[in-house]
Structure formats: structure tokens, C-alpha cells
Regions:
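Hydrophobic anchor at the beta1->P-loop junction of P-loop NTPases
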Residues: 5
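The conserved Walker
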Residues: 9
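Conserved lysine of the Walker
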Residues: 13
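Hydrophobic positions on the alpha1 helix immediately C-terminal to the Walker A/P-loop
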Residues: 16
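N-terminal phosphate/diphosphate-binding loop that engages ATP/GTP or pyrophosphate donors
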Residues: 22-87
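Residue-level signal for inorganic ion chemistry
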Residues: 32, 79, 108, 122, ...
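Small-molecule kinase domains that catalyze NTP-dependent phosphoryl transfer to phosphate-bearing small molecules
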Residues: 67, 112-119, 126-131, 135, ...
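ATP-dependent NMP and nucleoside kinases share a basic, alpha-helical "lid"
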Residues: 83-162
Length: 232
């Protein structure tokens, strides 16, 4: 069973997906981390001098995998733990070099589908319910007001030691929203078969509770109450 969570940057997709997976006893797939790891690897070269074919080759030849579970889960790139290095503003600014290139996206999407074929999964990203898993059992579109999203992202960056103001973050998210909605491939789209969850003013647990209500309604026999309790 695959549950997808799509939505704009800063909506809390990773945090909510992680908690939802824990509650359900499912595995969690952070597809954004995979794109960030591929971008980090690309930045070890000179991306400005790389053709589209070279970008695709670098991504295809990069070994990206997850290690560990829960809060100790790390993302490895060619055997190196890059969990912290992929969260820098420089990586964020350059993700488009991988995410907007169809040939570079292909091996990442194939890897995501391979992972989903082996387990029950909660997966989040920008195109999970549209391009990667269009037949997912339940699809969510998680959003929040831009200001709230900016405050969440600001806290993450400040915790990581980056000095950014709230006004700068709001402007960055406005640009990111425009970019994500107008990307040539893998654009952020809200489809009719997605359940919209607005997390503005909600805690993570409250957001997850709303999602579980939807899962119970749409797939009543998929997850037993005992399994859900075990996941808490």
C-alpha cells in the first residue's frame, strides 16, 4: 500500500509523513532527500559546465540509499553520509538541475518505485501522487499559509546555523512556489483525487489525525486499529 503526500515547500511534508508512517507502522520515503543527494553529488563537479546528458549520467551512476530507521535514518551518497550537507541553501538553489531534467529524474523515480514494491510506504514530495505513484491507495495534498510555511522553514534553517530573516524566507517561498508550479517536468499539481489537508494552525499530531481519518474512510480494511496503535 502506498500513501502519497504532495504539497508546496515548507508545508511540513517530511515531518508529517514521518509521523504518519510511524503511526501506521509503514516505511517512510523522503524523495526530496534523494533529489538533494543527487544535487549534492552534481555540485562536486562544475554543474555549469555539465550538459543535460552529463547530469543524467552523474545521477545514474550515483549510489543513493537510506541507512537506519526512524530519527536515526541517514541518507548515503556513494557510501558517504550527506544527511546534513544536502540541507544547505546552495543545494536548494541547484535542485532544479536534477529535478527539471527528465533523464536525470528517471533513475530516481525508478528507485522510488522499486522501494515501494517491497513494502507499505508513506512517500512525500512534489510529484508523488501525480507522476511517480498515480495509482496510490490514498493521496494527500498538504499545504499551509505561506507565512506559516516561511516560519517553519526559517526555524529549520536557524537550527542549522543559517542566518535568514522571515521576510527573506517569505520571498524565497513565493519564488519557490512559482517555480514548482511551472516546472517543465514534475511540476507541483493538486489533482481532484487528492485529499487537501491545510495544516495552518495545526500541530503535527492534529494533521496526522486528519490524514488517518481519511485513510480509514477510503481504505477501511487496509489498516487495522491494532496496527495503528502499534505504530504510535
Amino acid at each position: 500500500m502506498v500513501i502519497t503526500i504532495d504539497g508546496p515547500a515548507g508545508a511540513g511534508k517530511s515531518t508529517v509523513a514521518r509521523k504518519l508512517a510511524q503511526r501506521l507502522g509503514f516505511d517512510y520515503l523522503d524523495t526530496g532527500a534523494m533529489y538533494r543527494a543527487a544535487t549534492w553529488k552534481l555540485l562536486q563537479a562544475d554543474p555549469d559546465d555539465c550538459s543535460a546528458e552529463e547530469v543524467a549520467r552523474i545521477v545514474a551512476e550515483t549510489d543513493i540509499r537510506f541507512s537506519g530507521k526512524g530519527p536515526d535514518r541517514r541518507i548515503m551518497c556513494d557510501g558517504r553520509d550527506v544527511s546534513g550537507e544536502i540541507r544547505t541553501p546552495r543545494v536548494t538553489r541547484n535542485i532544479y538541475r536534477v529535478a527539471d531534467e527528465p533523464a536525470a529524474r528517471k533513475p530516481l523515480i525508478e528507485a522510488q518505485r522499486e522501494i515501494a514494491g517491497r513494502r507499505n510506504l508513506v512517500t512525500e514530495g512534489r510529484d508523488q501522487g501525480t507522476d511517480v505513484f498515480p495509482d496510490a491507495s490514498v493521496k494527500f495534498y498538504l499545504t499551509a499559509s505561506r507565512r506559516e510555511r516561511a516560519m517553519r522553514r526559517l526555524q529549520d534553517l536557524q537550527d542549522a546555523g543559517h542566518d535568514v530573516s522571515l521576510e527573506e524566507m517569505v520571498e524565497q517561498l513565493a519564488r519557490r512556489d512559482h517555480e514548482d508550479n511551472s516546472r517543465p517536468v514534475g511540476a507541483l499539481r493538486k489533482e481532484d483525487d487528492m485529499e487537501v489537508v491545510d495544516s495552518t494552525g495545526l500541530t503535527v499530531d492534529e494533521t496526522v489525525d486528519r490524514m488517518i481519518e481519511t485513510i480509514d474512510r477510503e481504505c477501511p480494511d487496509a489498516i487495522s486499529k491494532s496496527e495503528r496503535r502499534a505504530g504510535k
